[in-house]
Amino acid sequence: KLKESWDVARIGADAYYKRKSVESFICNFPDQPSSEFCGCSFTPDVTYAENRSDCISLTSQQLINYYVHQMILSEADRDSGEISLFLQPDYKFLFNLLASLNPSDSLKISQIVCVGTETTFTDDHQLTNLKYLHSVFPLYMAGHDYSLYYYYDKIEAHYHSFNLYPCMILTSDAALLCSSDYQTGIFFRSGEVLRMLKNLYISYQEQCTLFFTPAPLTPENHAVVIGSMFDSDFAENDLLGIQPESCLTPFFTGTLLREMFNHDLPNADAILAMAEQAFQMSMDKIKNQQFFIYSTYEGLLQFVRSGRTDEIPEIFYHPLTTEQRIQVLEGVCACCESGAYRFLQKPLNHLPGNLHFCIRGNSGTMIFKNNAGKIFVTSKRQSW
């Protein structure tokens, strides 16, 4: 506590807690489960299904949790379920429930969130916007059809300044409006009310921007995904990345790439040509001192042991042989000597194996595995 107080006084509270928030986001990024996780299937309460009241007042968080629980379970059991959320990602009960679901394949979840225009912190000194981003990632990890929309506003003014029930959860046959602290609310089942709220939600959504859409890196959509990563921002700007293992793809060129590549894939020639061009672009940036990667010794050792990298789905290539691994490590050593590759120190020397993140210009790319082991790529461009 004494050292923390000293650091706050020396650096300044805002700068200190911003850095700690980023550190917390990186160190606690959701990792792929060690064993297969397929979610849970539940059955809605019979009492909830039989209660057909059009309007019910909810006077405690326990009551709200009960109705939210039943709404979500009922919708997840439908053939074409749809859940619409107009609230911040600070309702832990709801987001834990959604992340644990094993719904029908056709369930769609959409959410509208307010992104703060000012730097604000939560009660535990976390950057509000960054904590919200961390809260929604388990839904992507679970493999849900989840779409996140956002708009800019002052969060405090929108949710906490005498606004009557600013939060809404909407399903096919029910709606719940509640306060921002999830303590009181109103539950609706009237068809007329539901149609009005649905139209209102759609009108709001049309005024918002889609935050990002993770795309699976597969042979079928390789062109779109690789193109989003190696775009004009990549070519024109310095690249700064953080990931468990050193970035190895710049060394996958020429004979090595052709030897390790899975030539049995559909469109193999096109995939190989695009990959070689992209990886060569990375090597050119290293030579031009425009490529800086921060990684861990643990991640590099994992590659040494397995001959695999989490940057590329396993379907695209064969594990590297011992000789090929040595060849790649020689390239990594040269990059360490030039300063392009650097190893993280405490407390970031034990990164989650699932985090691969890079920034180039006003764009960012994140690569992660979901609970089923599929690799997804998501890119975000910031407009200033």
PLM ranges: what are they?
Residues K1-S5:
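Basic, Lys/Arg-rich alpha-helical nucleic-acid-recognition elements, primarily the DNA-binding modules
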Residues D7-Q62:
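General N-terminal leader/first-domain-start detector
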Residues E50-W384:
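Hydrophobic protein-protein interaction segments
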